[in-house]
């Protein structure tokens, strides 16, 4: 029967059969109680009543009024029956709900009882005399935190109580309080890799090991035998030993190797190398056609003609030849910029093209350009330009004059290629391209592409629209958009890359010039860039470089460098730039100072010329770590300021013998000193004490001289050397002392595992360095 009310609806005879069917179904589905016989009897009588009520033969014999009365009676009976069934269902549902509530209350009561028993067993509650106050608190706590334990926890507690276990489970979490680990709880022993630089304090060492500074100080006291403070600098080798005592791994990192490690490519030998385009720079005298040659090559660029792009001035560009080979050109304003970049260590260029005008010949700046290129140790091609304006014999004259500048042409048995060209008429440009590619092939220029990118900065600028941008040339690897790179004392994320055609690029391969944006600072031309893994690493590198610059400024004062301190012991070479008033002075001084150089040291004249000192001379001296010698030449104040800024020394002379004596003195300073041993004392071993923590303590008697703490020790046994090393500790009684004199006893400890026997002789000595003279 449908739930909708049908009392207000008109009941027709046509719906009688449906009503009868619904009543039959409801009667058959209605529940009944009692015995089976009673059920059958009642069912039969009920069916008989309904059959009588809906007997159509009887209904037909009744009048219409009686039929309607009969139907209404049946309808009312059906509605009454439906209401009774609905009320019975609601009553049953209510009873079930009350039953669930009772069960839940019983469960909560049981849970409270269980919790009280567990807390009393695990001593998480106060003693019995305070139980009344805490009981109220517990009730409040349970009221707020009804579900403090999970179902699994309750099950475990119940099982523990049922089984009457002697040690019920203890839960770390207390009521309403998140479990916290005690700060006094010792964690797991974690082995760390600890970086040990050249200078490190105990405080910094403790932080890197994540150990208590008191424990580290105690370990130093036990191992070294001396008392330290947390801010004391310690020897890096001793620091490595202390790190290993704490079961960590020490990694020794020298500040001198840190920059080398930054540009180190792991697995370089196994990575595949591919040919890379040569990088070419045009140098020469003003108005000899360097820019015209560059423009001629640019106009002949196959890639530019095909793309129809507009060339962007980004300091460098790349052309594609007819043979689909690429050449990268650096567009510098002159050899001064070339040398300025080289002064920063940027040996970017592979090939230098010296441009000489056929109608002018070799000029002053041409000679400077030649000397700069030779100092950079790069391949040189001489391009004789403007042959369309030259007279017969001009080219041959230039070729024959090159040997006096140490450039031997191929026609004279040398290796310098000479190429007559015309930028205006575009004559022999293809041959100059072939010469460049031939030299590049002989040089076997290769680079790894599948690694992090590193390269050089060509130029940088600030644009109102783009912000700070820089032109880079990739030396190795592949530079991508999104890379984090470190350049100079700044780091940045590459936001965009544009080539010289103004086209956006997603990646740049080796020798490719590219303009990037998104820099945080303005880098200098010649700065080297490298891609790092994260901003954290980039920040650490920049902080290290800034600290290094700060230390150098403190050590060097007002940038007043001693040129000879910058010549390291490996090179043992003094480079000079010589400027004189006349050519006769140049020849006399050159021959005299050349004789001073011997096998131990070498004097190299980078550039010699008549005239005053120029900006180019200062830049060349900076790039080559050279000193400038000026004989009978005045030095302009601007040049002195520039030299002071660059850290270059200028020495002026009027007497040739003073110049030669100074050169002899400077070369003497460059000689390596002689190191010899000086014995300071002897001691005999009388007793050996085995101390577990500090190792063996050797009881000695000083028979001659003095034993100092900084002395080196030789252990002699029967006239033979048994051991040689450093003193680890020197004590008299329980005091640490610096030295022990003759006829006194002392206790010493040696570094390393030394086999010492009673009767051995300890020979103390020191190393003394003595200067040599030419």
Swiss-Prot record:
InterPro entries in UniProt: EF-G-like_DII, IF2_II, P-loop_NTPase, Small_GTP-bd, T_Tr_GTP-bd_dom, TF_IF2_bacterial-like, TIF_IF2, TIF_IF2_dom3
Residue ranges constituting the tr-type G domain according to the UniProt record: 275-446
Annotated segments matching region G3: 331-334
CC terms in the record's Gene Ontology section: cytoplasm
GO molecular function: GTP binding; GTPase activity; translation initiation factor activity
Region (G4): 385-388
Listed name of the protein: Translation initiation factor IF-2
């Amino acid at each position: 029967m449908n739930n909708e009310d049908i009392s207000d609806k008109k009941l027709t005879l046509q719906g009688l059969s449906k009503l009868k069917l619904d009543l039959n179904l409801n009667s058959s589905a209605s529940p009944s109680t009692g015995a089976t016989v009673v059920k059958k009897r009642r069912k039969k009588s009920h069916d008989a009543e309904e059959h009588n009520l809906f007997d159509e033969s009887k209904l037909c014999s009744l009048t219409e009024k009686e039929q309607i009365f009969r139907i209404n009676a049946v309808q009312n009976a059906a509605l009454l029956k439906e209401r009774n069934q609905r009320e019975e269902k609601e009553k049953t549902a209510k009873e079930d709900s009350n039953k669930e509530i009772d069960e839940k209350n019983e469960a909560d009561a049981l849970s409270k009882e269980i919790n009280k028993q567990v807390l009393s067993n695990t001593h998480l509650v106060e003693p019995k005399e305070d139980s009344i106050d805490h009981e109220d608190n517990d009730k409040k706590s349970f009221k707020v935190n009804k579900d403090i334990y999970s179902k699994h926890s309750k099950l475990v507690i119940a099982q523990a109580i049922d089984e009457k276990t002697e040690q019920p489970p203890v839960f770390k979490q207390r009521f309403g309080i998140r479990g916290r680990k005690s700060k006094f709880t010792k964690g797991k022993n974690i082995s760390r890799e600890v970086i040990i630089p050249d200078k490190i304090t105990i405080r910094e060492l403790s932080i890197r090991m994540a150990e208590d500074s008191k424990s580290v100080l105690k370990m130093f006291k036990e191992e070294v035998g001396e008392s330290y403070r947390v801010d004391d600098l310690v020897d890096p080798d001793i620091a490595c030993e202390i790190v290993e005592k704490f079961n960590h791994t020490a990694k020794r990192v020298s500040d001198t190797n840190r920059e080398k490690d930054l540009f180190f490519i792991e697995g370089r030998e196994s990575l595949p190398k591919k040919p890379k385009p040569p990088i070419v720079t045009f140098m020469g005298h003003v108005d000899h056609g360097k820019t015209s040659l560059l423009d001629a090559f640019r106009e002949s660029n196959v890639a530019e003609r095909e793309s129809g792009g507009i060339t962007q001035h980004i300091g460098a560009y790349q052309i594609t030849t007819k043979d689909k080979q690429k050449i990268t050109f650096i567009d510098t304003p002159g050899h001064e910029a070339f040398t300025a970049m080289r002064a920063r260590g940027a040996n970017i260029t592979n090939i230098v093209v010296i441009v000489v005008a056929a109608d002018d010949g070799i000029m002053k700046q041409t000679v400077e350009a030649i000397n700069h290129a030779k100092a950079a140790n790069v391949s040189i091609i001489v391009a004789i330009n403007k042959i369309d304006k030259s007279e017969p014999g001009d080219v041959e004259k230039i070729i024959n004059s090159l040997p006096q500048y140490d450039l031997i042409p191929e026609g004279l048995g040398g290796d310098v290629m000479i190429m007559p060209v015309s930028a205006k008429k575009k004559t022999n440009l293809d041959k100059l391209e072939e010469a460049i590619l031939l030299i590049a092939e002989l040089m076997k220029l290769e680079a790894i592409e599948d690694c992090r990118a590193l390269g050089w900065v060509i130029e940088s600028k600030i644009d109102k629209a783009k912000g700070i941008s820089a032109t880079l040339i990739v030396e190795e690897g592949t530079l991508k958009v999104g890379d984090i790179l470190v350049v100079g004392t700044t780091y940045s994320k590459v936001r965009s890359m544009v080539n010289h055609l103004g086209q956006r690029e997603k990646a740049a391969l080796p020798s490719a010039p590219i303009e990037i944006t998104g820099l945080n600072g303005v880098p200098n031309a010649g700065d080297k860039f490298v891609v790092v893994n994260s901003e954290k690493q980039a920040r650490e590198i920049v902080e290290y470089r800034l600290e290094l610059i700060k230390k150098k400024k403190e050590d060097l004062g007002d940038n007043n460098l001693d040129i000879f301190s910058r010549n390291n012991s490996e090179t043992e070479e003094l480079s000079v730039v010589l400027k004189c008033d006349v050519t006769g002075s140049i020849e006399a001084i050159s021959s005299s100072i050349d004789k001073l150089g011997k096998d131990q040291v070498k004097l190299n004249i980078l550039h010699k010329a008549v005239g005053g000192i120029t900006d180019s001379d200062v830049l060349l001296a900076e790039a080559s770590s050279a000193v400038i010698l000026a004989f009978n030449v005045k030095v302009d104040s601007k040049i002195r300021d520039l030299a002071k800024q660059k850290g270059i020394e200028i020495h002026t002379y009027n007497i040739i013998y003073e110049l030669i004596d100074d050169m002899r003195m400077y070369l003497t300073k460059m000689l390596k000193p002689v190191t010899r041993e000086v014995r300071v004392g002897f001691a005999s071993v009388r007793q050996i004490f085995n101390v577990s923590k500090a190792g063996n303590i050797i009881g000695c008697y000083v028979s001659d001289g003095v034993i100092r703490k900084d002395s080196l020790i030789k252990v002699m046994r029967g006239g033979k050397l048994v051991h040689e090393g450093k003193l680890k500790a020197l004590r008299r009684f329980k005091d640490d002392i610096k030295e022990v004199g003759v006829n006194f006893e002392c206790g010493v400890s040696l570094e390393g595992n030394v086999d010492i026997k009673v009767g051995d002789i300890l020979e103390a000595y020191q190393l003394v360095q003595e200067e040599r003279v030419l």
